Every structure is written in C-alpha cells, then in structure tokens.
C-alpha cells in the first residue's frame, strides 16, 4: 500500500514531467520557500522545489533548512511557547528581511508559526501553483 501513496508535489511533478503539465501564466511574485522538517527527513522536499521552479515568472528563494520551532504540538503548549519562538527566530528574521510577497511551505503548522512570527502571508505550494493555472474556459469566452 505504501507504494501507492505519494506526496502531492511528488505526484504533480511526475505528471508534469510526463507531459501532463497544464498551461501556466506568469506569476510575477517573489516567494521564500521554507522546508518543513518532516518533509526534508522523508526526502520529499526536492519535488516541491522542482515543481515551484516550473512556475513562469516566479522568483523563488529557497531558505536555509531550519526548524520553525513549532515541532508538531510542542510550540502550542504554553510552557514551550517562548522556546518555540526562539528556535524559529533565525528563520523568521530571514523571512522578514527577504522582501518576499509570500512565504511558501508544505506544512500547515509551519504556516501558522511563520504567519504569527514573521508576519507574512504563507501559502501551500499547490495554492501557488493554482495562481499560475490558465483557465481554458475563461480564455474560450474572451
């Protein structure tokens, strides 16, 4: 069964590289990509990065791999909150000084931590990909 389950960006990249890439319009945005710890450990981060590189017009900055500090539910606990912020502080500083339009991460808990502490809208890679999709039905009506 495990051979039948793929991470979404791995699946999409495989499809795109097999000739099934959708038409995309340029997304003239600068984004910083944060690698979630669990995605890096599983070896799946390269799929997300390669998929994001396929978005035309996108300025992609891959941040150094650092923990956001949330660590699952660790940072949600009141007694760990300050330590959690300290763990992620270098990452938050890098994001705040990046002049990016968005931060991008595959992990929802990283998203919460980044938005709370770096004060930048953070989106999933698939949401960014959706921005680039060309709606064929809209084009036909025009």
Located regions from the model:
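Iron-sulfur cluster-binding electron-transfer modules in prokaryotic oxidoreductases
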Residues: 1-142
């Amino acid at each position: 069964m495990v051979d039948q389950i793929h991470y979404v960006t791995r699946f999409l990249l495989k499809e795109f590289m097999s000739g099934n890439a959708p038409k995309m319009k340029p997304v003239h945005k600068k984004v910083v990509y944060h690698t979630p710890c669990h995605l890096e450990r599983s070896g799946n981060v390269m799929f997300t990065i390669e998929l994001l590189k396929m978005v035309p017009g996108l300025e992609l900055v891959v941040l150094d791999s650092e923990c956001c500090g949330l660590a699952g539910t660790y940072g949600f606990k009141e007694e760990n909150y300050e330590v959690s912020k300290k763990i992620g502080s270098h990452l938050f500083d890098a994001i705040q000084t990046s002049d990016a339009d968005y931060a991008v991460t595959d992990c929802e808990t990283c998203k919460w931590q980044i938005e709370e502490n770096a004060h930048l809208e953070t989106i999933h890679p698939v949401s960014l990909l959706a921005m680039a999709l060309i709606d064929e039905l809209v084009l036909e009506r025009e």
